[in-house]
A protein has these predicted regions:
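Amphipathic helical "hinge" segments at domain boundaries
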Residues: 2-73, 140, 151-154, 158, ...
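Active-site-adjacent beta->alpha loops and helix N-cap segments on the catalytic face
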Residues: 81-91
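Flexible glycine-/small-residue-rich
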Residues: 21, 78, 100
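Redox-cofactor binding/interface segments in oxidoreductases and associated redox assembly factors
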Residues: 19, 76, 198
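Bacterial carbohydrate/catabolite-sensing allosteric modules
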Residues: 35-46, 67, 90-98, 102-298
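Negatively charged, flexible loop motifs adjacent to catalytic sites
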Residues: 55, 82-83, 104, 227
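Amphipathic coiled-coil/heptad-repeat helices and related helical stalk/stem segments
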Residues: 2, 58-59, 82, 119, ...
Length: 298
């Protein structure tokens, strides 16, 4: 320990990086954190993990705490579309890598999956099964992944010549409650959608629970697909068709990028690393077989 302290004093570094996520209980972010930790441990760095709960105020408060602790870098899953977090970190010369989400701030590294392309592939899969009345349940309009996944949904519909119905686009939080709440709304409209695209795993799980509780048969009466795969213990019958993101690799690459810059490895001024997702087709998506009903069976 004394040697480690001496090294920190000489280098003026704490050998600590921070990972700021929206919700560490989401298995997607848990896997990202593991990738970050493994990469950091290999270079004798420690990792601090904090949760924002998608609150921009909480995000700023935590960043101030991390600045006071003099972390050597921040890996940030932005809670919104504000440039304030980046101005704050830049004022203290703390470098940042954006993880999972797209930002418009210049000179900021990004590591993420292609949300628009992944969403497009899921909706295109549903269209290929004959669905034309496809709904989407997504997160806040202020979050880039929500915006990009809706854009992919809209592009798939447009290319297939399917008119966009604003009533089939439902915004909420990336949460179990949000998925359940918005699915209940979709079940109340007539005609119902024949398929639903959930833009993250929490929304998907909440939506699936709402369907099962309403007695709606998946996929016979309604297909359901999700961006982000569900962990093994969450799966229920039927297992969900999903766009699986390489979460561990996203975390590992983001940490490596930050640590290589700290080590002085020559790199471009800005790097945007976009990793492909994998479409996994399971039993929750099927062809249109019956007309959607306005109310479930008793």
């Amino acid at each position: 320990m004394p040697n480690a302290v001496a090294r920190q004093l000489r280098s003026k570094r704490t050998r600590t990086i921070a990972l700021v996520v929206s919700d560490i209980t989401n298995p997607f972010f848990t896997s990202i954190a593991r990738g970050v930790e493994d990469a950091a441990a290999g270079r004798e760095y420690a990792v601090i993990v904090v949760n924002t709960d998608e609150s921009q105020a909480k995000e700023i408060a935590y960043l101030r705490v991390l600045m006071a602790r003099q972390v050597d870098g921040v890996l940030l899953v932005p809670a919104g579309n504000s440039a304030e977090p980046f101005r704050l970190l830049r004022s203290q010369k703390i470098p940042v890598v954006v993880v999972d989400r797209r930002v418009v701030v210049r000179r900021v590294d990004e590591v993420r999956c292609d949300s628009e392309a992944g969403a497009y592939s899921l909706v295109d899969h549903l269209i290929g099964l004959g669905h034309r009345r496809i709904a989407v349940i997504t997160g806040s309009r202020a979050i880039a992944t929500s915006v990009d996944r809706v854009a992919g949904y809209e592009r798939a519909l447009n290319e297939a010549g399917i008119p966009l119905d604003p009533a089939l686009i439902r915004y909420d939080r990336f949460s179990l409650a949000g998925g359940s709440r918005r699915m209940a709304e979709l079940l109340a409209i007539s005609p119902r959608p024949t398929a639903v695209f959930a833009t993250n795993n929490f929304i998907a799980y909440g939506a699936l629970r709402a369907l099962l509780e309403a007695g709606v048969r998946v996929p016979r009466e309604m297909s359901l697909v999700t961006f982000d795969d569900l962990p093994e213990g969450w799966h229920e019958d039927p297992y969900l068709t999903a766009l699986a993101q390489p979460a561990y690799e996203i975390g590992r690459r983001a940490a490596e990028l930050r640590l290589e810059r700290l080590a002085g490895v020559a790199q471009p001024k800005r790097q945007v690393i976009i990793l492909p997702g994998e479409l996994i087709i399971r039993r929750s998506s099927g062809p249109v077989r019956t007309s959607p009903r306005s109310v479930p069976d008793n």
